[in-house]
Amino acid sequence: MGEALNGLKRNIMCGDARESHIGQKVTVMGWVQRNRNLGGLQFIDLRDREGILQVVFNDDLGEEILEKAKSIRPEYCIAVTGEIVKRESVNPNMPTGMVELKAEELKILSESDTPPIYIKEDLDAAESIRLKYRYLDLRRPDMQNIFKIRHKTTKAIRDYLDQNGFLEMETPILTKSTPEGARDYLVPSRNYPGMFYALPQSPQLFKQLLMVSGFDRYFQIVKCFRDEDLRANRQPEFTQVDLEMSFVEQDDVMALNECLIKHVFKEVLGVDVKTPIKRMTFKDAMEKYGSDKPDLRFGMEITNLSDVVKECGFKVFTDAVANGGSVRGLCLEGGASMGRKDIDRLGEFVKTFKAKGLAWIQLKEEGVKSPIAKFFSEEELNKIIETMGAKTGDLILIVADKNSVVLKALGELRLELSRKFDLVKDKSEFNFTWITEFDLLEYDEEEGRYFAAHHPFTMPMDEDIKYLDTDPGRVRAKAYDLVLNGEELGGGSIRIHDTKLQEKMFEVLGFTQESAWERFGFLLEAFKFGPPPHGGLAFGLDRMIMFLAGTENIKDVITFPKNQNAFCYLTEAPNIVDEEQLKELGIETIKKEDTAE
């Protein structure tokens, strides 16, 4: 059993001790990083949230305290009182390396078993072990630093929004299921058997209702939930910086959020984000980069070759153009030295994005090398090379198909080439861009209907509203995404605030008037009572912290994350609950039939 504090007070953090404290009597508390005996002296590296301080136990302390110090193992939690003295052998690699604590008193507050993971930076341990013993993983200095950054970030956000007239307000966690997009997490109601709440995928409708309520400017740092397949940058529960503004247009929302981002990056990293942030339409982003979240830290734009090859002798190209598709290419500088096997691998890569193949042209010192060169005249080949802006030593890669396939395949190939050839030269760069004028709707050929590209509450562009009845796929949205280094950092839109227009939007999406009112009647009803024009935006806080902390895995920035299957190794959730609990909720579990042969 550990010793009690008995009124002992810590008066300095381990990592804060400096030369200015020399001669002072202090008490520090923390965890033992290392314990070693050198020449009759006992040295303990003591760690807390702020850093590590060397503690020395001299042989004049007496046998009892020395034996006690020798018995201490890594991760014991201890308290030491003594005097800060100048360190004989300075350690320039530690902020506290000029001083040490000459121990006078020692308390062992609690002991520790041998930890299953090392408490050190750059830990190389299985993710399952790290997540199972997350409380130990979080003791590591690099993990502690991430959550200091997270705290500084949320404080900077709150400070800025408070200074700009925003009210921090909470919205319900138990709400109504309005399935449109990702699956909801459902919560059964005991009071209403057979009925369910849903955990919110976002506070979207409630923040719009707060604008109808007259609060003018709202924000919230809020938990959201989506029951979807997970990737490296997704979790089933995640945090959004959610905000909404009344009496604004698109430029107003974008300008305020640019200033918010500028403030946060300056406060947290000391980095100056250049504003105004450049803008690019959705159409341009897709045409040039094959993505609505382009990484602009390197060039290599997609080039349209359709006009150049539409009458050539290569049937693959001419058929693609004749059938309404396109022929487009990328130019990899210095890529002519790539071997055939590597080029073939790129061909297999684009096939995973439904491309039928990858044509290529190498511009070697001795001339053009390409399996498709025989289908072109010298003049036609030169025209392709000229249009691509290629030179000797380069490699041209071409895809021909319907536009959606060509752009997707080349967009992904562009990123693959960037990874393979390290095309991003400045890894510390923060390259922001706004993507605007998104398509309002996306057509699903399998279901034979339109879906909202963002959500059903997005305002169409004024000049496109007339197409909702005749050509819905042509309608652009007053929507905007903020992209950073090829990742969507946040997104928002101006919202519909008119009952009739909102009903029309639901109609285009395939809702009957009855089903629209059943799901969203509370919003449509609110729009009858003088709603203001309003719009907003939501940032993914977890993703923002990933950028600020320099990590590529969202699990690193969440205290207790789930794995890729939404399972918690620490608590072993989800778990089976008692039959009595299920009975009280009116729920009966049904085993899935084993379909395996």
From Swiss-Prot:
Keywords: Aminoacyl-tRNA synthetase, ATP-binding, Cytoplasm, Ligase, Nucleotide-binding, Protein biosynthesis
Superkingdom of the organism of origin: Bacteria
Residues annotated as binding L-aspartate: E180, R226, H454, R495
First-level EC class: ligase
Main localization category: cytoplasm
GO biological process, one term: aspartyl-tRNA aminoacylation
Segments for region (Aspartate): 204-207
EC number(s) per entry: 6.1.1.12
Pfam family, one: tRNA_anti-codon
Compartments, record wording: Cytoplasm
Matching SUPFAM superfamilies: Class II aaRS and biotin synthetases (SSF55681), GAD domain-like (SSF55261), Nucleic acid-binding proteins (SSF50249)
List of residues binding ATP: R226, D227, E228, Q235, E488, G540, L541, D542, R543
Cellular component, GO annotation: cytoplasm
A GO molecular function held by the record: ATP binding
InterPro entries: Aa-tRNA-synt_II, aa-tRNA-synth_II, aa-tRNA-synth_II/BPL/LPL, Asp-tRNA-ligase_1, Asp-tRNA-ligase_1_N, Asp/Asn-tRNA-synth_IIb, AspRS_core, GAD-like_sf
Catalyzed chemical reaction(s): tRNA(Asp) + L-aspartate + ATP = L-aspartyl-tRNA(Asp) + AMP + diphosphate
Family: Belongs to the class-II aminoacyl-tRNA synthetase family. Type 1 subfamily.
Entries under HAMAP family matching the protein: Asp_tRNA_synth_type1
Protein purpose: Catalyzes the attachment of L-aspartate to tRNA(Asp) in a two-step reaction: L-aspartate is first activated by ATP to form Asp-AMP and then transferred to the acceptor end of tRNA(Asp).
NCBIfam families associated with the record: aspS_bact, PRK00476.1
Oligomeric and partner information: Homodimer.
UniProt protein name: Aspartate--tRNA ligase
Upper lineage: Bacteria, Bacillati, Bacillota, Clostridia, Eubacteriales
